[in-house]
Regions:
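Sec-dependent signal peptide recognition
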Residues: 2-8
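TPR-adjacent "capping" and linker segments in tetratricopeptide-repeat scaffold/adaptor proteins
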Residues: 21-22, 53-69
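Terminal, low-structured helical/coil segments at or just beyond the last alpha-helical repeat
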Residues: 56, 160-209
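Alpha-helical adaptor scaffolds
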Residues: 64-131, 136
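Register position in tetratricopeptide repeats
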Residues: 79, 113, 147-148, 180-184
Length: 209
């Protein structure tokens, strides 16, 4: 009986490892295609396939199916605006499976929608530790930095995403806008400094009071 149990356990471990290796191989091939896509439409087809893999728990068993169902349920709650319920559900998934990058990424999205930007960034950091190629998490990181008015960091996040996904539409659109915001901030700051300097002159002092 013990011998049979050992064979079953070894079989399950082998099956799990094969699935994990198969998943990794599929992602590697898709990321290669994503990086070498010649146009946006073909890149978006590859992107969709990557998301389909990310959103399914890596374990091809009953537990994995259940966690995938919970993630889908949480995403549905998030889309309905039930942010607190979604947050609690994603937190439960993370407690059960802390190594699943997409659980952290979806909770980061909820935290962003709840205006908890630093907490969202913390979850994104873990997401990227688990899946360094997660262009979605990098885009989310950029959005959080934008809300925090850290525009240079937002640009860096978008550029990091572009190294993985060169034709990423949001990065192409947002980087020029962010550069304009930085320039506007610099001009505004320069004017403020000039005005303050002018106020130090005795002739201008009364006008500044």
């Amino acid at each position: 009986m013990k011998k049979l149990l050992g064979i079953v356990v070894l079989g399950l471990l082998f099956f799990s490892n094969v699935n994990a290796e198969d998943r990794k191989n599929k992602l590697d091939k898709l990321f290669f295609k994503l990086k070498n896509s010649k146009n946006l439409s073909s890149a978006q087809i590859v992107e969709k396939k990557i998301w389909e893999i990310w959103l399914i728990h890596p374990s091809d068993d009953r537990r994995g199916f259940r966690l995938t169902e919970l993630l889908t349920q949480g995403s549905r709650l998030m889309n309905m605006g039930e942010l607190n319920k979604a947050y609690k559900l994603f937190t439960t998934i993370i407690a059960t499976e802390p190594d699943w990058s997409e659980a952290w990424n979806t909770r980061a999205t909820v935290l962003y929608l709840m205006d908890r930007f630093q907490s969202s960034l913390d979850d994104i950091k873990i997401t990227l530790t688990l899946e360094p190629r997660h262009f979605g998490a990098l885009s989310g990181q950029a959005l959080n930095y934008i809300e925090l008015k850290q525009y240079e960091k937002a640009i860096q996040s978008y550029k990091a995403a572009q190294k993985i996904y060169p034709l990423l539409d949001s990065a192409e659109k947002m980087i020029p806008e962010l550069k304009n915001l930085i320039n506007d901030q610099a001009i505004s700051l320069s004017k403020k400094i000039l005005n303050q300097h002018a106020c130090l002159q005795p002739a201008k002092l009364k006008q500044c009071i």
